[in-house]
């Protein structure tokens, strides 16, 4: 049986945490709820695994929040394939129509919700700079490899191709030659639960598709999730070994208006 939601999940006193957040996809309500639950501090390393934009309703709001986090925590923002598509479409390196069909229309609309047509000129230059200059291809610590999509098991992160880092599905993951665990997103887990293998964990839990946005306290092995409705739940890595169900997880619902 999973235990009740913790008031401040996985935050022992005086311990720097490494936190990893899966694909956000424009779901700013879920991100705000998750940040309120996890409370990343200045000493915490917060790795966001990419795909901040597209599909969900508020990519602009998500990017505003991420830029704000740069001043309040040690943010390590990774680039995802949807950021690559966004930048390529803005710079006309690809036909924008292809990007618009995979969630780009929602992104542009978030910058100009009252416009009857897509207003490309409303996209924030600050957001473009953040994505193109400050988002990185990968992050690595002593025990873990953080990538958006996947990594070729036989190459260092510095030698990975774009195809592996941004486009290869989690199904094709294998133990890395470094012996480190890989933590990634990209491949939506429509069950709503992280996909855990002995050598890798996928944290994309389909928040834009009525799933959850997941944050993992990497060292403690604790997961906290939030959704667009404002609900929160948490569980441990050990509990995932015995697959949980919606009936065995304590879910904290948002307070009713006026309560």
Q: At which residue positions do the language-model features occur?
A:
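N-terminal active-site segment of His-dependent metallophosphoesterases
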Residues: 1-63
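Acidic, His/Gly-rich catalytic cores of divalent-metal-dependent hydrolytic chemistry
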Residues: 13, 174-259
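Active-site neighborhood of divalent metal-dependent phosphoester bond hydrolases
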Residues: 55-136, 168-172
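Divalent metal-coordination and catalytic microenvironments
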Residues: 23, 51, 66, 80-81, ...
